[in-house]
């Protein structure tokens, strides 16, 4: 089966390489023949309706609006620009005119959050007592006994070594 497939491949290759014995280039290119359209009859001369091209979609239209002619002075409503959102407004408020002396309420600045509040630095001449809390003792589970000093001969309990296990 393998030899049969190999023989087919060899024959195909030989035909493809050596099959075209005409080495001269063709003198003129081959032309495809097309059928001609039927000729119009003399009585068949009625006009053909060609529809107008559709205007582009309004959302896709990109050309500018047509300019108004000078004779066509129709008033056009142009809305006022919307003011910016109050939280996004960044420009300064307009200055009050001297004739308009209405009192303006300006709220007091808010104090900082208690957790973010910092005490002012003490001045060198101000000697008020400052409460400094004692350092917290370590957690009982993390507490370590202090190391014995060499001059302190406190008896230290050293347990006896355990006897070996009977099965070992």
Curated annotation (Swiss-Prot):
GO terms for biological process: defense response to bacterium; innate immune response. Residues 20-42, 63-70, 91-98, 119-124, 145-150 form a propeptide. Pfam families: Apidaecin. Coiled coil: none annotated. Residues 1-19 form the signal peptide. Its main location: secreted. Residues 158-168 have a biased composition (Pro residues). Keywords: Antibiotic, Antimicrobial, Cleavage on pair of basic residues, Immunity, Innate immunity, Repeat, Secreted, Signal. It is found in: Secreted. It comes from the Eukaryota. This is Apidaecins type 14. The gene is APID14.
């Amino acid at each position: 089966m393998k030899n049969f497939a190999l023989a087919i491949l060899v024959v195909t290759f030989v035909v493809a390489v050596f099959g075209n014995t005409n080495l001269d280039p063709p003198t003129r290119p081959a032309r495809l023949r097309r059928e001609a359209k039927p000729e119009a009859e003399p009585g068949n001369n009625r006009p053909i309706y060609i529809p107008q091209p559709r205007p582009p979609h309004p959302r896709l239209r990109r050309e500018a609006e047509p300019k108004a002619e000078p004779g066509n002075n129709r008033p056009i409503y142009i809305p006022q620009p919307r003011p910016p959102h109050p939280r996004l407004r960044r420009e300064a408020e307009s200055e009050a005119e001297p004739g308009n002396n209405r009192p303006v309420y300006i709220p007091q600045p808010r104090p900082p959050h208690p957790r973010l509040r910092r005490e002012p630095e003490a001045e060198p001449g101000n000697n008020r007592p400052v409460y400094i809390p004692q350092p917290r003792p370590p957690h009982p589970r993390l507490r370590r006994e202090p190391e014995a000093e060499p001059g302190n001969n406190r008896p230290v309990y050293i347990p006896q070594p355990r006897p070996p296990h009977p099965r070992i």
